[in-house]
Amino acid sequence: MSKVLFVKANDRTAEEAVSVKLYEAFLNSYKENHPNDEIVELDLYRENPPYLGRNAINGTFKAGKGMELNEDEKAAAAVADRYLDEFVKADKVVFAFPLWNFAVPAVLHTYVDYLSRAGVTFTYTPEGPKGLMGDKKVALLNARGGFYSEGPMAAMEMSLNYMKTVMGFFGVQDLHTVVIEGHNAVPDDAQKIIENGLAEAKKLAASF
């Protein structure tokens, strides 16, 4: 039995957002095909994690060094530890997120900030940083209304590329992606584009 963490970074409904359609399609297919796995859903907009700042940075640093924390640092470090522990303990992690203004939603960036901790998800070596999450399986589900996989807009895609870079930095080797793109650029083909992407997500979930 695997422990699977589903992370959703969009507070719109499935009727409003393609990335939420992707999330629900993958989740439902996964549940159907892996009925014995333990699933944890993390809705980042519902969680509304505070931005990474002084108290969290100082608190986690001091805790790692065995130093005394003040009350604000303890509270901030506890939040950071909770998200990090949940991620580390998961055998598989699924992220669903849109491309907004060329990047990930701020709430997802904040969440990733909490995951990036030396000595846990990566470590420093004389040869450079080394990821420590090599045994984790990750799926990235991304939706963007325009075409960003190639052509002049490719250099402006900092959503999926950001998440792929972070997961690679963490040492994740078993990385899968499903992307739905162009449904706003070509509205006449939108339904077909979305349906094909959802079918791909369901297929991946069945074997994930």
Swiss-Prot record:
SUPFAM superfamilies assigned to the protein according to its UniProt record, in alphabetical order: Flavoproteins (SSF52218)
Keyword Lipoprotein among UniProt keywords: no
Entry's cofactor comment: Binds 1 FMN per subunit.
Disulfide bonds: none
Gene3D superfamilies assigned: 3.40.50.360
NAD as UniProt keyword: yes
Enzyme Commission identifier(s): 1.6.5.-, 1.7.1.17
InterPro entries xrefs: Flavodoxin_fold, Flavoprotein-like_sf, FMN-dep_NADH:Q_OxRdtase_AzoR1, NADH:quinone_OxRdtase_FMN_depd
Keyword annotations: Flavoprotein, FMN, NAD, Oxidoreductase
Cofactors: FMN
Pfam families: Flavodoxin_2
The reaction(s) this protein catalyses: 2 a quinone + NADH + H(+) = 2 a 1,4-benzosemiquinone + NAD(+); N,N-dimethyl-1,4-phenylenediamine + anthranilate + 2 NAD(+) = 2-(4-dimethylaminophenyl)diazenylbenzoate + 2 NADH + 2 H(+)
Single GO molecular function: oxidoreductase activity, acting on NAD(P)H, quinone or similar compound as acceptor
Reported function: Quinone reductase that provides resistance to thiol-specific stress caused by electrophilic quinones.
HAMAP family named in the record: Azoreductase_type1 (MF_01216)
Assembly and oligomerization: Homodimer.
PANTHER family found in the cross-reference section: FMN-DEPENDENT NADH-AZOREDUCTASE 1 (PTHR43741), FMN-DEPENDENT NADH:QUINONE OXIDOREDUCTASE (PTHR43741:SF4)
Entry's family note: Belongs to the azoreductase type 1 family.
Protein name: FMN-dependent NADH:quinone oxidoreductase 1
Gene that produces this protein: azoR1
